[in-house]
């Protein structure tokens, strides 16, 4: 249905977008395929940093630290995504930035379990696990975890 108040170009764009949404994107959005399988290029750790993927029984964690520096401080990063989306490269870039802003602090980013497959309190349990892991496995002092 055309809106007479909208330009011909505006109506054309709306019709094209509606066609795309109904044909190629409707199923992947409804099924969650776009959320579950995001398409991103492989992340490359920048020079001067060490990067380790830590596999737990429930979820992966990514530990980033500057080469040759140990400040005794670490940032526990809980990425955005509203507890429904996976970690993306932008959060890996944030981890590098956080490390620089903290004058060489380490950063642990967790790719916590997300809803609807893992409802509350799964993500919270993952965050607590990561906090305890930093204390028990990496021997950080609790007051040095941000």
What are these regions (language model features)?
Residues 89-109:
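Short amphipathic alpha-helix adjacent to the substrate-entry channel of hydrolases
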Residues 138-146:
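Alpha/beta-hydrolase fold nucleophile elbow
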Residues 82-90, 107, 133:
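Serine-hydrolase catalytic-loop signature spanning alpha/beta hydrolases and amidase-signature enzymes
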Residues 72-82:
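Short beta-strand element of the alpha/beta-hydrolase
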Residues 1-66:
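A glycine/proline-hinged amphipathic helix-loop "lid/cap" segment
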Residues 118-138:
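Alpha/beta-hydrolase active-site loop
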């Amino acid at each position: 249905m055309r809106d007479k108040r909208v330009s011909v170009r505006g109506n054309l764009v709306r019709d094209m977008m509606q066609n795309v949404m109904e044909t190629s994107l409707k199923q992947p959005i409804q099924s969650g395929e776009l959320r579950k399988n995001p398409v991103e290029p492989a992340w490359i750790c920048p020079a001067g940093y060490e990067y380790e993927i830590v596999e737990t029984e429930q979820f992966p964690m990514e530990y980033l630290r500057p080469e040759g520096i140990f400040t005794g401080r670490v940032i526990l990063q809980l990425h955005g995504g509203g507890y429904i989306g996976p970690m993306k490269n932008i959060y890996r870039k944030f981890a590098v930035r956080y490390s620089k802003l903290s004058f060489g602090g380490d950063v642990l980013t967790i790719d916590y379990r997300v809803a609807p497959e893992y409802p509350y309190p799964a993500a919270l349990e993952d965050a607590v696990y990561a906090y305890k892991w930093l204390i028990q496995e990496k021997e950080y002092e609790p007051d040095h975890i941000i």
